[in-house]
């Protein structure tokens, strides 16, 4: 679904922000990309979204190069940044109606309400202005937009940053629901616990390079923490009992 081949990005002659990334994310997979600030996570997402042009290599969506078929590839994608961009003076329902139409999906308002139900928002909440929503509720509207758009891949940049544990757990559950329906999920995060609990596979990025990937099934959080620290900070930490 999402494929990077020798994907690279250099800004203004500096060191590579992304250095020869090779990665494939399959339908139904939740891939969590871990790394410190400046590691290249957001650059990777921006390249798949065609927000920026690569310095080398290719980013493909469903086999299509995003730079060669930007309109075609965008219709398959939904994007949720750390702060979901919604119109504060419109209701949740009005926002969903607007962004669905923008993506070429037109619905009767009554047909949009089931999307709110799917993400755990009530009809009453759907009719409230976004200015009254918590961050967790706004993130849920972002998921509802992806559902209404019928996106086949969802890209997220630090989506649980600032959420309380309950809201984070609910959000992770929604991502797992999407993956069970065949949506490819690519989440950039620095939260090891959330990556382990949410992802089917995690990758570790450092200074623009993908230095390791691993399946999360059977992986203990303490093992992931140790591997991450060894790769990022070259800190040797002995395995601990849980």
Positions of predicted regions on the chain:
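Catalytic Walker B motif of ABC-type/P-loop ATPase nucleotide-binding domains
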Residues: 154-157
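Conserved ABC ATPase "signature" region
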Residues: 97, 109-125
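Conserved ABC transporter NBD signature motif
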Residues: 57-68, 72-73, 212
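Helix N-cap at the start of a conserved alpha-helix in ABC-type nucleotide-binding domains
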Residues: 165-167
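A short, flexible loop at the N-terminus of ABC-type nucleotide-binding domains that lies
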Residues: 1-4, 8-20, 70
């Amino acid at each position: 679904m999402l494929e990077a081949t020798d994907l690279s990005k250099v800004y203004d002659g500096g060191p590579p922000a992304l250095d020869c990334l090779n990665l494939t994310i399959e339908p139904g997979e939740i891939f969590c990309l871990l790394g410190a600030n400046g590691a290249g996570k957001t650059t990777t997402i921006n390249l798949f979204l065609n927000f920026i042009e690569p310095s080398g290599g290719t980013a493909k969506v469903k086999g299509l190069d995003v730079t060669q078929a930007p309109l075609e590839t965008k219709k398959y994608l939904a994007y949720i940044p750390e702060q979901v961009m919604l119109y504060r003076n419109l209701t949740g329902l009005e926002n969903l109606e607007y962004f669905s139409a923008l993506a070429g999906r037109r619905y009767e308002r009554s047909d949009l309400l089931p999307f709110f139900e799917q993400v755990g928002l009530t009809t009453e909440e759907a009719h409230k202005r976004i200015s009254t929503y918590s961050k967790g509720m706004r993130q849920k509207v972002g998921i509802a937009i992806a559902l209404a758009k019928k996106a086949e891949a969802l890209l997220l940049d630090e989506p649980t940053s600032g959420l309380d544990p309950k809201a984070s757990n609910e959000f992770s559950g929604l991502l797992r629901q999407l993956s069970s329906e065949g949506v490819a999920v690519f989440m950039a995060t620095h939260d090891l616990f959330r990556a382990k609990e949410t992802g089917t596979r995690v990758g570790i990025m450092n200074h623009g390079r993908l230095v390791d990937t691993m399946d999360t099934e059977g992986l203990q959080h303490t093992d992931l923490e140790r591997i991450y620290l060894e790769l990022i900070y070259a800190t040797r930490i002995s395995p601990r009992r849980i």
